[in-house]
């Protein structure tokens, strides 16, 4: 930076406001520099290299005895290619009150954005804040794309935290979704786009917000300017690289438990840049198994259906009824015990009782339930034939957003 004239006393205070997500760093890493020209004005220029447009937001919380060439706060969309930047530069220079001095040593990739011109015989002072983000600011209400569920075709996973979730889904993550994928489960692209961010070096995770920056992620830029954000991947769990084009349904990587997470899962959201250089998640809808539009709900499980996928037979826990087991009697090997057997389909638990004795028994079953409802009540009495399994009840959560548990006790006596 060239020296300022002796008549000017200038205090420079820079603040870089990073576009930081709870679930990953989304800052494209641009620079904002300045030089003083021989005309006394201070010229600010950007240096950005990328594969998609970048938005730079600038404000001056303090500006004393300096005349800006543009009103503030102000934002600029900086295109990724040098040819496009040169075209933008021509229009920006036309907005300056005077052309920059010819001896101003701006780097070849520097894009002059604005200037500050000191007022005569005055001490000057300014504080500047700026923020780079990917993409072009847009109206978050203008998106109506239907997404694929981000897991393999024919598989089903549950929404464990939805829009406005109390654990982490607020602020810019207001419209995020958590799916109960386990460590190593495949993640697939919910929509086609260009990969513009990958982090996969972390092996740290936990429920505290102190782990937020450790979340591995893949960030995909869509053709309408929105971004698909896939978070909590396992270490070295990304199969794509920055610059790759991915198709909807394509395998991206593997789920994990990194970053701020109380357990393994996939965090997915769609976000758009805002005019103040930040990000805002937007509500998303998905294509259902039967081609209908789905607004995802906490506690419900959904099948992924991808174009070209093989037909499969779906099974939903919510569709199971006691009537499906009317007259159910299943032979079991001979043994010396009464045993409870359970099956879990989505958030529905099917409860069976096996009598492996070579004798029929009268059995009274008592259920101790936490946040669960039994379709047969908490006390069930059954006569169970020898070496036979019988159906007892269905258990479903009263509130899918809370945890649930059950304890089953029974007493029995042989039938004459």
Predicted feature descriptions by range:
Residues 45-52, 62, 353-357:
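Asparagine-centered strand-capping/turn motif at beta-strand->loop junctions
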Residues 52-60, 69-71, 189, 360-367:
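Short, hydrophobic/aromatic beta-strand segments
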Residues 67-121, 372-401:
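Intrinsically disordered, low-complexity Pro/Gly/Ser/Thr-rich segments with frequent PxxP/GP/PP motifs
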Residues 145-147, 151, 160, 239-241, ...:
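Acidic, glycine-rich catalytic/binding loops that coordinate metals and/or anionic ligands
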Residues 182, 188, 225-249:
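Short histidine-centered loop motifs in beta-beta connectors
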Residues 105-108, 112-215, 321-343, 359-360, ...:
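Surface-exposed, glycine-biased beta-strand/turn segments
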Residues 247-259:
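Short hydrophobic beta/alpha edge segments that flank linear recognition/processing sites
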Residues 10-19:
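Bacterial N-terminal signal peptides
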């Amino acid at each position: 930076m060239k020296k300022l004239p002796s008549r000017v006393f200038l205090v420079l205070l820079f603040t870089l406001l990073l576009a930081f997500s709870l679930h990953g760093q989304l800052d494209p890493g641009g620079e904002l520099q300045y030089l003083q020209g021989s005309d006394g004005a201070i010229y600010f220029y950007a240096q950005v290299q990328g594969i998609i447009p970048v938005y730079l937001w600038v404000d001056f919380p303090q500006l004393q005895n300096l005349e800006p060439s543009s009103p503030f706060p102000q934002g600029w969309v900086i295109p990724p290619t040098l040819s496009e930047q040169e075209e933008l530069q021509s229009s920006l220079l036309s907005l300056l009150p005077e052309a920059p001095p010819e001896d101003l040593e701006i780097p070849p990739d520097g894009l002059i954005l604005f200037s500050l011109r000191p007022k005569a015989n005055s001490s000057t002072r300014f504080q500047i804040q700026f923020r780079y983000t990917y993409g072009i600011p847009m109206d978050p209400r203008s998106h109506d794309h239907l997404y694929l569920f981000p897991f393999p075709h024919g598989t089903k996973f549950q929404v464990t935290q939805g829009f406005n979730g109390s654990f982490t889904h607020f602020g810019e993550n207001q419209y995020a979704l958590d799916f109960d994928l386990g460590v190593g489960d495949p993640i697939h692209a919910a929509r086609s786009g260009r990969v513009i961010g990958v982090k996969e070096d972390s092996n740290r995770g936990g429920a505290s917000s102190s782990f937020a920056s450790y979340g591995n992620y893949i960030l995909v830029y869509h053709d309408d300017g929105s971004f698909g954000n896939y978070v909590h991947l396992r270490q070295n769990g990304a199969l794509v690289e920055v610059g790759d084009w991915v198709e909807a349904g394509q395998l991206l990587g593997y789920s994990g438990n990194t970053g701020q997470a109380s357990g393994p899962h996939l965090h997915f959201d769609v976000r758009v840049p805002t005019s103040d250089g930040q990000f805002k998640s937007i509500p998303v809808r998905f294509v259902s198994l039967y081609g209908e539009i789905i607004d995802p709900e906490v506690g419900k499980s959904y099948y992924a259906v991808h174009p070209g996928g093989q037909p499969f037979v779906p099974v939903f826990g919510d569709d199971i009824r006691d009537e499906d087991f009317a007259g159910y009697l299943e032979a079991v090997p001979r043994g010396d015990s009464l045993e409870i057997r359970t099956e879990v389909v989505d958030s529905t638990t099917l409860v069976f009782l096996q009598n492996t004795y070579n004798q029929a028994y009268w059995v009274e079953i008592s259920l101790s339930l936490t946040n669960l409802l039994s379709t047969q009540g908490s006390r069930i009495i059954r006569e169970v034939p020898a070496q036979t399994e019988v159906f007892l009840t269905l258990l479903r959560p009263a509130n899918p957003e809370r945890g649930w548990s059950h304890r089953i006790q029974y007493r029995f006596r042989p039938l004459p």
